[in-house]
Design a protein with these regions (language model features):
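Bacterial Sec-dependent N-terminal signal peptides
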Residues: 1-30
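Second-shell loop/turn segments in exported
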Residues: 26-29, 45-50, 74-75, 108-115, ...
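Active-site nucleophile/metal-coordination loop of metallo-enzymes that catalyze phosphate/sulfate
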Residues: 26-35, 48-129
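Loop/turn elements at helix/coil->beta-strand transitions in domains of secreted/extracellular proteins
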Residues: 34-39, 66-70, 130-137, 181-186, ...
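Metal-dependent active-site segment of extracytoplasmic phospho-/sulfohydrolases and closely related
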Residues: 40, 59, 213-251, 262
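Substrate-binding rim/cap in mid-to-C-terminal beta-strand-loop elements of soluble/periplasmic
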Residues: 89, 252-280
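Catalytic-site neighborhoods of secreted/periplasmic enzymes
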Residues: 96-101, 115-166
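Active-site His/acidic residue clusters
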Residues: 143-158, 172-216, 220
């Protein structure tokens, strides 16, 4: 069965964003009712294990029920944060884009190809090239995420870490941005439950409490999409970078690499189980 590094996520984004291109020199697309917006939500360290072992996450489960999903999406190797997010954003593995470590800020290996900004191509820059007027947002909690994207492609970029004073992290910023700007492409990347998994353990009560809290953040983002009046034209994708074991990460076991991947769009088949091997 064919494996894909960026799998359906890249295909859906490319497919959806092609609908926003109105360049006069191109013939109009034959397909109708294509989505106009893509919201990519990332929960760093989210595991399939927690969903199979008691995590409530009602909004997450509703996404699975109303769209397409798999609980067997595998991280790349090594299964740690920066190199996995880079692979999802760039549609290639570390051997090509060159980001190989947990905290990579620049490629440890020379990128196989680079764009005009001397970076390996990523979905944000590629979309900006295709749709110069598009609204593209990037909201993130972990500072390391800033080094994995084409920042020049962003219409809006905000670092909003989760803290005791700000327990919802980047959620308030994302909610306001979605309501005001109705972005064509927006990535909202949380630093949790990764921190709790490393600090307390990937099967700890604290980890399960955190993923349920993140589900409430997901609810707020989904409500914002709805209140912005764009729900029917929006694909929402939820992705995780990796999982760990006990308090570690980066291993080669399926338990450390398996993570969930749901897609939600009102105009597509419900409860669809993604049949292909997926990786990213």
């Amino acid at each position: 069965m064919k494996k894909q590094i960026l799998f359906i996520c890249c295909a859906v984004i490319a497919y959806c964003l092609s609908a926003c291109n109105t360049a006069p020199q191109q013939a109009p697309l034959k397909e109708k009712n294509l989505p106009k917006h893509v919201i990519l939500i990332g929960f760093d360290g989210l595991s399939a294990h927690c969903l199979n072992n008691g995590a409530d996450m009602p909004t997450f489960r509703k996404m699975m029920a109303e769209g397409a999903s798999t609980l067997e999406n595998r991280s790349i190797l090594p299964s740690s944060s920066a190199c996995n997010w880079a692979s999802m954003f760039m549609g290639a593995g570390p051997e090509l884009h060159g980001y190989t470590e947990w905290g990579s800020r620049t490629p440890e290996l020379p990128s196989r190809v680079v764009n005009s900004d001397n970076r390996f191509p990523n979905i944000f820059g590629l979309y900006r090239d295709k749709a110069p007027e598009a609204e593209i947002g990037y909201i993130y909690e972990w500072e390391g995420m800033n080094y994995l994207v084409d920042t020049l492609a962003m219409s809006f970029r905000k670092h909003a870490p989760m803290s005791t004073e700000n327990p919802n992290g980047c959620t308030p910023v994302a909610v306001q941005y979605i309501k005001e700007k109705k972005p064509n492409l927006c990535a909202i990347i949380y630093d949790q439950p990764d921190g709790t998994g490393h600090g307390k353990g990937w099967s700890s009560p604290e980890y399960f409490a955190m993923v349920n809290h993140l589900d409430s953040c997901l609810t707020q983002v989904m409500d914002a999409v709805r209140e912005a009046g764009i729900m029917d034209d929006t694909v929402v994708i939820l992705a995780g970078a990796h999982r760990g074991n006990q308090t570690g990460a980066g291993g080669q076991t399926v338990k450390k690499r398996a993570k969930p991947l749901p897609f939600s769009w009102k105009k597509r088949k419900k409860r669809f189980q993604v049949p292909r091997s997926t990786q990213g």
